[in-house]
Amino acid sequence: MINLQEQISLFKIIGSQLKNKVECIAIGGSAMMFYGAKNATKDVDMVFSKKEDLEDVKNILYKSGFDERNNIKGIFREDETAGKPTMMDGKDTRFDLFLNEVIGFQIHKDTIERIKEVHDFGNFTVKTASPEDILMMKACTERERDRDDAAELVRKFNIDWNAVINESSKQTKIGIAAFPVLLYDFLTELRENFNVDIPKNITKELLLIAEKRLEELKKQDKLIKVTKYK
């Protein structure tokens, strides 16, 4: 685990060693610490838009004592092609470096437009994803601590639920087709098990979006039948 000041120190090291300007988006606990919504985090999660930028940061972490984890245990809901991170293990924390998507959640211009803060560390610019985007990304994982983080996000911030609904609809076309169902299950769990105030009209709307997308895929004959054998 590292706290905000320790994270800032690591970002300063990266910025001082980069030869060119590199930008990324902080998500998860890393972004939540910048927002003051979390005191410490186990993972520093970052999304890059360029492969070469990710590799530059990865190489600096390697030279700073981090090792790449080759055997990534699945935290993926949909399939093994969902945006896997490059994981760099350190003594007190782990960097998860994503490229353009987070476990199937696609990063695009609307995600960037919703960014709330920008932190400059020399050649390293770290932008913080919006609380709405952090919440939606956490719906794509199966880690229990992500439920705790998501509950804190909803309690601390005035979530723009219209943005969540609009993004959920968009993700069905550019990311995971079943994303509204994942988010519905996730938010329902937060409401029932974490006593979080999730508007019922929002979860209802998510199901309607999912049903609409399912009908579209049926008409286009793009549904895939999956049979599981035990």
Identify the residue ranges that each predicted region occupies.
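Compositionally biased terminal segments of proteins
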Residues: M1-K230
